[in-house]
């Protein structure tokens, strides 16, 4: 049984979408049990529609919900201990849940997760990892917005954590890792990226294979299993890709409705278009994973529909089932044991 | 007459593609005259095919061509004064051409352009501006790779230069400017971006309208006319968008060829698909503009076909015709005059 704590009030639509999303995930994975955190009055009407879900869940009525607009510091001040967001995270800390999922505001969720769960030993700053659809399947890209301006050692930590996540998610033994960089040779700056490359080469880690630098266009190609970058450029890459996909979908829609022949063609090719739409549907790949904390927290897109919420829950399910945090801890321990000489009488 | 100096040896295909590209541009703009720099033996067979082009151009035989793989420092050492790339830039300096165009390697072209033309007064570092196709038309995005890690004042300079380019290219009086940032509030780091925002608000510049921060997904929407960022994230955004467009084109191709019905649909909708392909064709929007130098240099994609080369030439044509560098100089002068109190007896 995988126990998932779910913030029912998160996202642009709250329980109206989060509850049907949970029902979808449960349909596909009957070994999920839920711990719900919500505002009772608002949730009850939707829960009533899913009796099977209601049976497989425990509901906790909370004092308040964090809004999508609140600043992290404000959310933390107002919502600590009492909000649906905080309490869903806390359930992971107390051991009442294996993973927490929320579609609430990213900054607040990260602030609360850091405050409540704290970072793992040897990890200075957490990262948000995104699952990126590629021509070869999927890659992991981190950090997409938790830390701005990581140094070489932090990029190294991201590589270790991303590698562990790839092993948990894709079931490959030695995922390939690339550092996101610009193609122009001999450019000034971004010394941290070059230095991280040196660290990765020299560390020669069993659990991952360092493939060198990759560029923005390698993301969609799926050149490597894990792409490592600091949060500013990672966030910009993620949102640029989402924006470009929407833009092209819009061009396509316009092209297909412009002439009668095109509309007829659309009807003939409808199943192909449905397949394409599925590929382009961001809700099919949803769920940013917070890495580096003492507990797994999944962030769903705020604008996700029920299918998107289900996808985020399923990412959490996979991560918990495959022992993501145990894998990360082991990898970090191995790396740091190699790196630091033993301290104490034996070392003398 | 707009005089364009063209490096015939640049790009993955050299004269075989650059010369037909020049012919296309000339067809569409009979008021172009060309100054060509190439290796005679390699260029003659292709030039012979375009008698009208040959008539409207002067050919200079050069000693050598810079390769696509050469490091900037190496290219500069070997190719200064004598290469086709250097000499096409130098023609702008000497006044023999209004603008230089090359599809050669970006790092080498930037290094030579900086060395030969030098930066404008008040500009510390040049930028590369890309023309970005959007749902509303086109935007300008800079810097896409010349400077890594710009400070607030450099971002301010980019805004002024991008604004001048928007006025030259789109013929709007007061283009809107956004600073590329991540959406999460209260994030640490990227103080330069916040500081640049403050500078832009306070400067209250006549020639541009500051619209605040934009995110990666605003690029494709066309939220503002000019998006300003430093070169690392700009380069990653550009290549991520290109990669995503290719990825979706590949999905589309696969979806349309999968079933017989889809293939029939494709035939019916072919003209719509052609329109879509046109929208997605990177060669239709080609030509990175080097800004901040005492002369205009246009960088074409190395992999551009003849249509792409023509597009880059036409960007140069537009920039020269609309007096881009004059506009930039005027805007910089106005800004710095407001900014610095007069020095001398009057100020006392």
From Swiss-Prot, chains A, B:
Chief subcellular location: cytoplasm
Keywords: Cytoplasm, Lipid biosynthesis, Lipid metabolism, Phospholipid biosynthesis, Phospholipid metabolism, Transferase
Catalytic activity: a fatty acyl-[ACP] + phosphate = an acyl phosphate + holo-[ACP]
GO biological process, one term: phospholipid biosynthetic process
Pathways involved: Lipid metabolism; phospholipid metabolism
MF-aspect GO terms: phosphate:acyl-[acyl carrier protein] acyltransferase activity
Cystine residue pairs: none
InterPro entries linked to this entry: FA_synthesis, Phospholipid_synth_PlsX-like
EC number: 2.3.1.274
Compartment(s): Cytoplasm
GO CC annotations, alphabetized: cytoplasm
Quaternary structure annotation from Swiss-Prot or TrEMBL: Homodimer. Probably interacts with PlsY.
Similarity comment: Belongs to the PlsX family.
Function: Catalyzes the reversible formation of acyl-phosphate (acyl-PO(4)) from acyl-[acyl-carrier-protein] (acyl-ACP). This enzyme utilizes acyl-ACP as fatty acyl donor, but not acyl-CoA.
This protein's name: Phosphate acyltransferase
Lineage: Bacteria, Pseudomonadati, Pseudomonadota, Alphaproteobacteria, Hyphomicrobiales
